[in-house]
Swiss-Prot record:
Keywords assigned by UniProt, alphabetized: Plastid, Ribonucleoprotein, Ribosomal protein
GO biological process: mitochondrial translation
Record's subcellular location: Plastid
GO molecular function: rRNA binding; structural constituent of ribosome
Family to which the UniProt record says this protein belongs: Belongs to the universal ribosomal protein uL16 family.
Entry-linked PROSITE patterns: RIBOSOMAL_L16_1, RIBOSOMAL_L16_2
Native organism: Aneura mirabilis
Signal peptide: none
Protein's UniProt name: Large ribosomal subunit protein uL16c
Length: 137
């Protein structure tokens, strides 16, 4: 699972998912991409599941770029623990995806292969997504 090697602080506030993605909202590396249409936290496990799905479908052809990284720690309390006594310990990591954010990019494969691979990865995501390409509108 992808996670930061080290962070300045162990725990973070939850924050709010307001607005649209102003950065990382256009294709930079490949020819085709999977773009988020809704705001959500995407866990490291979901990112990894999508990566595996795309690489398995595309086989050896093409190159994949993962444009999101889980850098936000999510804390959880142990089961049957009384309230109080501080915040829980970090359990897993999430990436913040706002509408318009590019999740994955792929290049070096045909449009049909790219679309099918991204569709499989889209099923692994907790949000609605769109398949976009440089030549497609």
């Amino acid at each position: 699972m992808p996670s930061p090697k080290r962070t300045k602080f162990r725990k973070q506030h939850r924050g709010r998912l307001k607005g649209i993605a102003t950065r990382s909202n256009s294709i930079c590396f490949g020819k085709f991409a999977l773009q988020a249409l809704e705001p959500a936290w995407i866990t490291a496990r979901q990112i990894e599941a999508g990566r595996r799905a795309i690489t398995r479908y595309a086989r050896r052809g093409g190159k994949l770029w993962i444009r999101i990284f889980p850098d936000k720690p999510i804390t959880a309390r142990p089961a049957e623990t009384r309230m109080g006594s501080g915040k829980g310990s970090p359990e897993y990591w999430v990436a913040i995806a706002k509408p318009g954010k590019i999740l994955y990019e792929i290049g070096g494969v045909s449009e049909n292969v790219a679309e099918a691979a991204m569709k499989i990865a889209a099923y692994k995501m907790p949000i609605r997504t769109a398949f976009i390409g440089i030549n497609i509108n």
